[in-house]
Amino acid sequence: MHIEIRKRGKRKLYYLAHSFRHGDKVRKLRRYLGEDLTRNAIELLRQKAEKSILEQASSLRAIRDPLHTILSSKEMELIKALISKGDIRIKHLSEEEWLKFAETFAYNTNAIEGSTITASEARGIIEENEWPPERSKEEISETYGVAETIKYVRKTKEHISLSLMKELHRIVFSNSKAFAGKFRAPGIEVAVTDSHGNIIHKGAPQRQVIAVLRELVEWYKKNRKRYHPIVLAAVVHNQFERIHPFQDGNGRVGRLLLNNILLKHGMPPVNIELKNRQEYYQALRTYENEGNLRPTIELILKEYRELRKLLKRM
């Protein structure tokens, strides 16, 4: 940001100006500070003006929740610019690369939810059927379950449905959870807490779960040809996580749904890494609190770059 001075007769008018890229264009925002100001007055006025400019710039960069608002042409331009810069050029995966992806995805998606199985142990479980003696049978079965669900996602022709959601959950948790493949029963409400026990998210009331899931399915059917696949996948994933239809296991099913949408549109799969867990959670919070999809899109593009690096090392 910088100070601009404009002269009108004998008067000097002071502005705080800020230039930034918005989509494929450069935007400039200004705030009027006053006339004939001293240096101290400029500094005092600058602080408030700077905050105002940053808030406006942030709102301009935001991508609204398409579930409730049709995206504007400027937002569509912004998405196009983000994706073009994201460089997601990844060839279709070979069977060897799919195996590597399944192992990496199974490790990370379970670790995000607290699994203690390491990356090398996940590889041994999936490739060699090796059971680490110090790990629980539940963690081991969920590692198998995620890998099997990746196979299912590759084969199914379904994009999204309530039966698909339940089937993904059933495959992952069939040997670890009694409620595998079943939405929350009456009286079961869920909340997500942080490490201090503070509630950071409450799922939809149990009695509303079926209705809001159907709304999501209908939105996807209506908009599947309107928006870029990454936008579709991000909305489906984020909205699914907001609803939290299962008693447990929503994060893993949500990330599988994310990949299912991408694959059905000819896109490569994406792996949300454990090291990016906080960024992932923050993207979900920003979507829930502000209706801003941009952080989720940026994270997906970031993970595509990481996937390309992983495949190059094979």
Question: Where do the model's predicted regions map?
Answer:
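FIC/Doc superfamily catalytic core
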Residues: M1-D248, R252-M314
